[in-house]
Amino acid sequence: MELKGKKVLVAGLGVSGIALCKVLDSLKAKVIAYDEKEYDVLKENLEEIKSLSIDFRFGKFKKEFLEGVDLVVLSPGVPTDSDIVKTAQEKKIELLGEVEFAYRFSKAPIYAITGTNGKTTTTSLLGEMFKNTGRKVYVAGNIGYPLIYAVMEAAEGDFIVAEISSFQLETIKEFKPKISCIINITPDHLDRHKTFENYRDIKGRIFENQREDEYTVLNYDDPVTWSLKNKAKCRVFPFSRKSLLENGAYIKDGSIYISVNGNAEKIIDIEEIYIPGEHNLENALAASSVAYLSGISADVIANTLKTFKGVEHRIEFVDEINGVKFYNDSKGTNPDASIKAIQALKTPIVLIAGGYDKGSEFDEFVKAFNGKVKKLILIGQTAKKIRDTARKYSYPEDDILFAGTLEEAVKKAYESAKEGDSVLLSPACASWDMFRNFEERGRIFKKAVAELRR
């Protein structure tokens, strides 16, 4: 793609947008960087690009921002029904999403992972499997390292493992992974995608350009994910925790097996997998399937599963103070993710929850408390909504506390906990009402726990 001298507008100046600006500048494009937020809000983000020859625009979108523009590249956070998108379409200006734009530069094959929950763990785990073969691998995408950086660095013989979100899949055109994977699909981001059916179909776009010599790996146990198989024009490879499969990855006699064309091979005994929980078994099956189909040996897969310790902010053990364990699950940004965290812990739980309202319902989340959650400490925009749902299912009002800050929530949680309990931050909500992102929320939680020792 020749961009020298072309006028390119980057919409959205988060992590991806900043990366796009840097790469476009290096490709000698004339870059316009736009965000609806004002400069003062974005000042910190813009530090690394402020010295580049970029034309910055902030605040409410104006049609003249697109005057003479050849290409608009959208960051994932910019909705497809926004004014900038509608205007670009009216003016017939080429419009590419960040992932689509990056894909067009890629020399290396991309192994793409999506799903509502488990994406980051599965992507990281798969990246480790590639790394442990001695291959040069880039782990990128929604995981925090922009895909555009990875494709610019990766050579033809390298590999890219990418976590891909529904926001990124909305705008693909030619994007075609070597192997794709959908771990699961449960309601999320309905404030953006409007209906669950829309959300499901956008997730299914991950394999829409793959053909018969390529694979998509799908969760056989999840009816919503498995229903997408009929749309696939490529080979479908299932994984299951519950059923024996003639062709796919499955559990038999306490071990993971993978069978391709009827030839089954044992990978590992489940008890040898380092990261705990049923949801992590699902992640292990998904990552192992993609690795095996890409030619990675059973030995390398097994050794990685024995040593991989999980990812930051996902049921991350933080500390134990006076017999009370603290876990950071700030990555629990929807009810289903937080249900999995509650299920993974075997002790009584003091739960810190609440945050930005994405339009989720919390009925299943509250039902999962199941006698395990002894105190509920609520923060953020959804605090009252979760409280009302908890009361609907007769959760004791005396066991529900509110906190104005996460630091206050941690203090209240510690005061409420006894030796043998776990304090779990698993908000079941996004972080944007109080924090820049879930990483910041997780770091503040860990700092607040450390303060308890002072």
From Swiss-Prot:
> Which UniProt keywords are present, listed alphabetically?
ATP-binding, Cell cycle, Cell division, Cell shape, Cell wall biogenesis/degradation, Cytoplasm, Ligase, Nucleotide-binding, Peptidoglycan synthesis
- Compartments where found: Cytoplasm
Pfam families the UniProt entry points to: Mur_ligase_C, Mur_ligase_M, MurD-like_N
One of the record's GO cellular component terms: cytoplasm
Which terms under GO biological process does the entry name? cell division; cell wall organization; peptidoglycan biosynthetic process; regulation of cell shape
Please give the SUPFAM superfamilies that the UniProt record associates with this protein. MurCD N-terminal domain, MurD-like peptide ligases, catalytic domain, MurD-like peptide ligases, peptide-binding domain
Transcription regulation as a keyword?
no
Question: In what pathway does it function?
Answer: Cell wall biogenesis; peptidoglycan biosynthesis
User: Which domain of life, per UniProt?
Assistant: Bacteria
Q: Which HAMAP family match?
A: MurD
Name this protein carries in UniProt: UDP-N-acetylmuramoylalanine--D-glutamate ligase
Q: Tell me the name of the encoding gene.
A: murD
